């Protein structure tokens, strides 16, 4: 979904629950992908998961996209394509990092969205309920940044 994630996410979740004959009150925890990935999409998903968990009185569990890819693949380096010919990668013992996509040997790319969501759900179900609330996993700073100059003054006409 290129645009409109915030508007479509709640109806989409409601449709998924209804298709499985599950109500919000039936949930015991909420799993959410925390990235790395699309900056805005990750922020929307994490904020929604935290809000739902708070309102339902259940924990929200954050799962790294790279960990979910690793859980769903037999081999390769978990890899998420990033802008400008780069990729987010993570070796088994290392922290996520940003590298040139062409430098990744044997990349394990995200599977179909449904499979990635299932891997996130499995990892969240197996995780401790006592961890910190999920937060976006940022490997690099956002492209947009606050203005460095002071905000302009608005003058009265009087």
Model-identified regions with their sequence ranges:
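N-terminal beta-alpha supersecondary unit
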Residues: 1-28
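Oxyanion-binding and handling regions
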Residues: 4-7, 58-158
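Generic beta-strand or strand-like secondary-structure segments
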Residues: 8, 12, 47-51, 65-68
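Phosphate-handling active-site elements
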Residues: 19-25, 53-63
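Short glycine-rich phosphate-binding loop at a beta-alpha junction
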Residues: 25-33, 106-111
């Amino acid at each position: 979904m290129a645009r409109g994630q915030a508007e479509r996410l709640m109806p989409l979740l409601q449709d998924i629950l209804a298709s499985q004959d599950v109500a919000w009150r039936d949930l015991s925890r909420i799993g959410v992908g925390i990235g790395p990935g699309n900056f805005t999409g990750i922020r929307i998903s994490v904020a929604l998961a935290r809000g739902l968990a708070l309102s339902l009185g259940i924990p929200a569990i954050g799962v790294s996209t790279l960990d979910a890819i690793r859980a769903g693949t037999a081999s390769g380096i978990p890899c998420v394509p990033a802008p400008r010919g780069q990729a987010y990668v993570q070796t088994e013992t290392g922290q996520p990092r940003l590298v040139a996509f062409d430098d990744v040997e044997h990349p394990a790319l995200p599977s179909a969205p449904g499979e990635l969501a299932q891997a996130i759900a499995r990892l969240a179900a197996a995780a401790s309920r006592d961890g910190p609330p999920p937060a976006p996993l940022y490997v690099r700073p956002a492209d947009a940044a606050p203005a460095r100059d002071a905000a302009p003054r608005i003058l009265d006409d009087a």
